[in-house]
Amino acid sequence: MKHAIKHIHFVGVGGVGMSGIAEILLNLGYTISGSDLADSATLQRLASLGIQTYVGHEAAHVAGADAVVTSTAVQADNPEVLSAREKHIPVVPRAVMLAELMRLKTGIAIAGTHGKTTTTSLVASVLAEAGLDPTFVIGGRLNSAGVNARLGQGDYIVVEADESDASFLNLSPVMAVVTNIDADHMETYGHDFGRLKQAFVDFLHRMPFYGTAILCTDDPAVRDIVPQVTCPISSYGFEEGAELRAVNVRAVDGQMHFTVQRRNGVVLPDLDVVLNLAGRHNVLNALSAIAVAVELNIADAVVQKALAGFKGVGRRFQRYGEVRAQDGGTFTLIDDYGHHPVEMAATLAAARGAFPGRRLVLAFQPHRFTRTRDCFEDFIKVIAQADAVLLAEVYGAGEAPIVAADGRTLARALRVAGRIEPVFVDDIAAMPQAIADNARDGDVVLCMGAGSIGAVPAKVLEMLQISELIPQGGRGL
């Protein structure tokens, strides 16, 4: 071909979704370059693989590129995007490039407002344990592999399908999971929940006639769309009527034990499962992975081994270890990406189940002013479930501040509600010291949020002596 694509440049390559696709394309033999606004561990890792990386955006960075990939976070007036268009270099949205990768293999896409990253990781881990060597692109670092993306030699590719910008409508998988449908990123859908549900229907209809929809029918909005889904459905959940149903669910030493009853088309024997994750919400995530395994005829023993040995995902209830408290004892430090009230409630419940009877200290940084405004009352209810709260200012993620949707107003509302007396931390740089000052012997300190609070746990470890470090790697993919 006259215009064969050999060199692909990524604008915003430091993002978790962009970096994974860049790495896979590199392993497919393409020349890859990329830029990001700030240096990061991700940029340094990509550079170590042989990718030309740049800090900052300049028109010269696209020189020699045959295609330029952008994420939705990249503005249309970005100098690299403008230069590419001026030179008639194709500018490709990230989701379109992901769709092109999926065309090379049999695609399994994980959609839903909450739980996508963990579920994608569980599915990839089950396929890997079965020897299927999947390709995967995940929105977080899979601890067992140490990466968020990998090019496998097998027939399957497992990816997250992102509804936040409706980009999942570019994908055409042959199997699709929908974990739940909740009101988030509603600006994409004109603040119309009906449009959001219809987008999920449209996503499922992008599968071929032989595709399978794996749906969590515990979720009311998912149940609402079932009559509109035209392809075969495999349902899962806790409630009666689900074809894969978890019963006898219990928390044991930070793990979840449960039994799966399987009635999807054929009656399969009950399956006893030990899941190396905390929380009932993760039981649902595991059920979807089990449903995928049933569709692919993966042996039960393989599924049980994969779930029992699952090493977790970075920033998803990630235990950093036992840290020395200033009063001479120790506290448990946990990091989590949760930033929506529904996610936070599930994670707080998981912490209660994993550490019964212990004081729970929540260090939370709200993410986006629009979400803080739209979910204000729900945030008050869920934050008050902790025993002590360290509340940071909102991480704007590029949004302009909104009156009465900031961290200080949220802290004031919590005080007025009389449920808890939060400590307001105006500068996130002061959060590690705030944790050190407030954590006591026996506490569980949970850092939560999708913004810059992700760097806080490591800084806490730098400040305070570690009593017992939890290993973050292990055998697996």
From Swiss-Prot:
Compartments, as annotated in UniProt: Cytoplasm
Binding site for ATP: G112, T113, H114, G115, K116, T117, T118
Pathway the protein takes part in: Cell wall biogenesis; peptidoglycan biosynthesis
EC number: 6.3.2.8
Domain of life: Bacteria
Keyword annotations of the record: ATP-binding, Cell cycle, Cell division, Cell shape, Cell wall biogenesis/degradation, Cytoplasm, Ligase, Nucleotide-binding, Peptidoglycan synthesis
InterPro entries: Mur-like_cat_sf (IPR036565), Mur_ligase_C (IPR004101), Mur_ligase_C_dom_sf (IPR036615), Mur_ligase_cen (IPR013221), Mur_ligase_N (IPR000713), MurCDEF_pg_biosynth (IPR050061), UDP-N-AcMur_Ala_ligase_MurC (IPR005758)
Protein name: UDP-N-acetylmuramate--L-alanine ligase
Organism: Albidiferax ferrireducens (strain ATCC BAA-621 / DSM 15236 / T118)
Species classification: Bacteria, Pseudomonadati, Pseudomonadota, Betaproteobacteria, Burkholderiales
